[in-house]
């Protein structure tokens, strides 16, 4: 699914496909994300802004919303959102990425509060710190990647 262009019916179809194949869903790990531009807000391209918001904030919301009925069928389902340090302490030039991560942190709280007394679905947000990815290399081009943990190394945080 292309999160930058996905429409509601695509999320609905995904839920239908999962239901037909598995009957329930045990968890979602929202790890898809794009950086966008590291540039002053006054110069930020509106199309890039929209794409970052669609991938980093709208897609996790839409996926969780559409898959929630399947999550509620599982005995102990979990939704994990991923954030970043800029999600709670914005830094200059991080633009749409920082705003989307702040939104993710609030979205996590909203889902957790709304589901706390009505289901067994757990909702959490994790900031895994720096992770060796292409996006990290784009954001920090002078950083030595050997000093940054890989996705495999941080996976225990999510289990």
Regions found by a protein language model. Give the residues of each.
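Rossmann-fold cofactor-recognition segment
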Residues: 1-8
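Substrate-binding pocket helix/loop in short-chain dehydrogenase/reductase
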Residues: 14, 39-41, 45-50
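Conserved catalytic-site loops of classical short-chain dehydrogenases/reductases
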Residues: 26-27, 50, 76-82, 121-124
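Conserved NAD(P)H cofactor-binding loop of Rossmann-fold oxidoreductase domains
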Residues: 31-37
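Catalytic loop of short-chain dehydrogenase/reductase
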Residues: 34, 72, 76-117, 130
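A short, exposed helix-loop element centered on a Lys and neighboring polar residues
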Residues: 64-65, 109
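C-terminal helical subdomain
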Residues: 121, 125-126, 133, 142-159
